[in-house]
Amino acid sequence: MENGFNEEAVDAAVAEAQTLGEEERWDEAHSLLLEALEEQGDTPLLLCWAGIAAQRLGSDSEAYDFFRRTLALGPEDPFVLATAGSGVALFDDPGAEGALRTAALVAPDFPFARAAYGAYLAREGLFAEAIGELEAARALAPGDAEVHADLAIAYLLAARQDDGVAALEEALSLRADDAWMRALYGLALLEARRGEEAAEQLHRAAAERVEDVELQLLSALASADQGWDDEAWNALARAEAAASAPDHELIEEVEDALQEGGDAPGALLRDDLAPSLLRERLLQKA
């Protein structure tokens, strides 16, 4: 027993939670970690992993509270600093920058720490510094799809279009089943005026993310712009099936463009919908 908690018990609880998480059993991991916190009290490692579990379950406010409490204990472990720092950064917490910078400084050979700090810097608009951190992370972990994706996002936010597209291609070569990343790739291809390739990628991503209304509408317009009428109307139908009330106005606008035909779908796609959604999703991921 040290510092009021049993270190072996904490490590065992975290190891079990990690195993459950790898099996996508995050609800069980969450319950296990709450029990461990009740038994052992607040420790940075337990709080951090409780934050991870809450985040995976979509409980963002609960995750933020766990990550905030983690940092309040002054952790030194770079994984804990980088994870909790990234977690509170999503809520613009002023403690994020210090935690992420410290993690990258104390563990310069730890790719997750470098990538987490780089992603934060990209979101803050410090693109040169962000790219430096993320390129360092890529050199340390060339087989990590997430690092390539984060670097791609920094490149695209910095208007380095070709580099961003290439980094997304590399990320997808490592994790081909990531439909969210594929949708981002399709948007980047649209920005690069590679319309047919973009339509193919958006169509493929939309077939997997059927509840993503915006993606269905992007796919509908991109398909129509290529003359793929059946694919366009099928994507619109999926959007209508998944839509909630705020989506209806945009759906009607896309439907009008499909009915008008000609240049209308491509114009709505390239001049309006795609640029705004690209930036929104880049910042969402960063």
PLM features: residue spans?
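Conserved structural position within tetratricopeptide repeats
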Residues: 4, 34-38, 68-72, 101-106, ...
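TPR-adjacent "capping" and linker segments in tetratricopeptide-repeat scaffold/adaptor proteins
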Residues: 1-12, 38
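Structural signature of tandem alpha-helical TPR/SEL1-like repeats
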Residues: 23-31, 57-69, 88-102, 124-136, ...
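Eukaryotic alpha-helical solenoid repeat scaffolds
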Residues: 179, 183-187, 191-286
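Short coil turns that delineate tetratricopeptide repeat
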Residues: 41, 75, 108, 142, ...
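Position-specific recognition of the canonical hydrophobic site in helix A of tetratricopeptide repeat
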Residues: 21, 48, 55, 88-89, ...
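Canonical tetratricopeptide repeat
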Residues: 49, 83-84, 116, 150, ...
